[in-house]
UniProtKB/Swiss-Prot annotation:
Region (NTD): 1-120
EC number: 6.5.1.1
Domain of life assignment: Viruses
Keywords: ATP-binding, Cell cycle, Cell division, DNA damage, DNA recombination, DNA repair, DNA replication, Ligase, Nucleotide-binding, Virion
Comment text on domains: The N-terminus domain (NTD) plays a critical role in DNA-binding, catalytic complex assembly and catalysis.
Swiss-Prot/TrEMBL catalytic activity: ATP + (deoxyribonucleotide)n-3'-hydroxyl + 5'-phospho-(deoxyribonucleotide)m = (deoxyribonucleotide)n+m + AMP + diphosphate
Region annotation OB domain: where it falls in the sequence: 318-419
Record function comment: Very low-fidelity DNA ligase that seals nicks in double-stranded DNA during DNA repair. Together with the viral repair DNA polymerase X, fills the single nucleotide gaps generated by the AP endonuclease. It is not essential for viral replication and recombination. Displays a very low adenylation activity towards DNA with 3'-dideoxy- or 3'-amino-terminated nicks compared to regular nick DNA.
Protein's name according to its UniProt entry: DNA ligase
Catalytic residues, chain numbering: K151 (n6-amp-lysine intermediate)
CC per GO annotation: virion component
Organism (species): African swine fever virus (isolate Warthog/Namibia/Wart80/1980)
Length: 419
């Protein structure tokens, strides 16, 4: 239960993250709220059991620390909590649990006062997946098992509360969603009960609706209020190193604060011991009508997708699609070891072109092909041939196959014999 609150314990005192601001003279000021448990005039360790059972003769104390850069620390008077609330009811709290709830409420209130409004340049791009249909072995070498979640084929969205109390909902590319009032209304209610500095990372989705329809609704100024927001992660801008398993614990606690939400949901988590268990879950999710599965490294930090960075702490599992496309040209890779390695260029019926990586050719073969294949040889032997292409999905914007890899030609052709 202690892990459900932002912050950490040091010397038996739990401190929430500092809320920082700037003084009129330009110095950095920090405000911190803390909770300690005292029994017989001694500060004792805070345990999870204290959130469900009171400790005899123990009281909880809340206090704040305030200091300005290069200045002394000022500590407030103690606020003592001697009993819980709603005693005898389902939602009863112990002394310690009530103290933490009171401290969180004060923390949020102070954060609202000090937190500046977001601007578009202040949006944090969400974490992106690096691995496709590969789960690194390191995921299973951690003390905590990796987490598997359903992968919905929806539109990525991140939510946060601005300094004026309004809700900002933005896309993977940091574009604000102007509609979705049904979701924003519930987010505003939810932020009354949780840390206002938290970002909620998820997907806009409606089960069994095509991605094109979902994207149209998400980007409309006036939508049909049918989309739901499925939250699969959360993060704090000043605590990006927080491991994934703790973020998931905090996310669970967030949703416990308000359980009557209709359009906002926490994505279900499944712990797995090995790759086979993850693959079985992927197959189950696909049968249920979902796109596949996401695997999260339990100890992985939150790594924002700045400059299209893809995090090595995420893996996506989903079935591959394949189709035949007309080969119209060839080119080479642009950087690293792909520079000088041949790539095929295919064309869609609407004349849009896309690049395809040969799947079964070694780099040595690809280098040799690009070096020796002439336009004349290409036109004579390969131009206009049907190429079988394996891909992850079609781009909802362009219809172009994504992560395209050439499996082979429809008619038997050994491209290495051409040169």
């Amino acid at each position: 239960m202690l892990n459900h609150f932002p912050g950490h314990c040091s010397n038996n005192i739990f401190c929430f993250p500092p809320i920082e601001s700037e003084t009129k003279s330009g110095k950095k000021a920090s405000w911190i709220i803390c909770v300690q448990v005292v029994q017989h005039n001694t500060i004792i360790p805070i345990t999870d059991e204290m959130f469900s059972t009171d400790v005899k003769d123990a009281v909880a104390e809340i206090f704040t620390k305030f200091f300005v850069e290069e200045g002394t620390v000022r500590i407030s008077k103690m606020t003592r909590v001697t009993e819980g609330k709603n005693l005898g009811k389902k939602n009863a709290t112990t002394v310690v649990h009530q103290a933490f709830k009171d401290a969180l409420s004060k923390y949020n209130r102070h954060a609202r006062q000090k937190r500046g409004a977001h601007t578009n340049t202040g949006m944090i791009p969400p974490m992106l997946v690096k691995y496709f249909n590969i789960i690194p072995k390191t995921f299973f070498e951690e003390e905590t098992d990796p987490i598997v979640q359903r992968k919905r084929n929806g539109v990525r969205a991140v939510a946060c509360q601005q300094g004026d109390g309004s809700i900002l909902l933005y896309s993977r590319t940091e574009k604000e969603f102007l509609g979705l009032d049904n979701i924003k209304k519930e987010l505003k209610q939810l932020y009354l009960f949780i840390d206002v500095r938290v970002y909620l990372d998820g997907e806009l989705y409606l089960h069994r609706k095509p991605l094109q329809w979902i994207a149209g609704q998400a980007n409309a100024k006036t939508d049909s209020s049918e989309l739901h927001f499925y939250v699969f992660d959360c993060f704090w801008s000043d605590q990006l190193q927080m491991p994934s398993n703790k973020r998931q614990q905090l996310l669970t606690n967030i949703f416990k604060q308000k359980e009557d939400l209709t359009f906002i949901h926490q994505v279900e988590n499944f712990s797995v011991k090995n790759e086979d268990e993850a693959l079985r879950l992927k197959a189950q999710f696909i049968k249920e009508g979902y796109e596949g599965a996401i695997v999260r490294n339990a100890n992985g930090p939150y790594e924002p997708g700045y400059n299209n960075y893809h995090s090595a702490h995420l893996a996506k599992l989903k079935p591959l699609l394949d189709a035949e496309f007309i080969l119209v040209d060839y080119t080479q890779g642009k950087k690293g070891k792909d520079l000088g390695a041949i790539l095929w260029v295919c064309e869609l019926p609407n004349k849009k072109r896309f690049v395809v990586t040969p799947k079964h050719l070694t780099y040595a073969d690809r280098y040799a092909l690009f070096q020796k294949l002439t336009p004349a040889l290409f036109k004579k032997h390969l131009y206009g041939k049907e190429l079988t292409v394996e891909y992850a999905e079609l781009s909802p914007k362009t219809g172009i196959p994504l992560q395209a890899r050439a499996v082979g030609f429809r008619e038997p052709i050994n491209v290495l014999e051409i040169i």
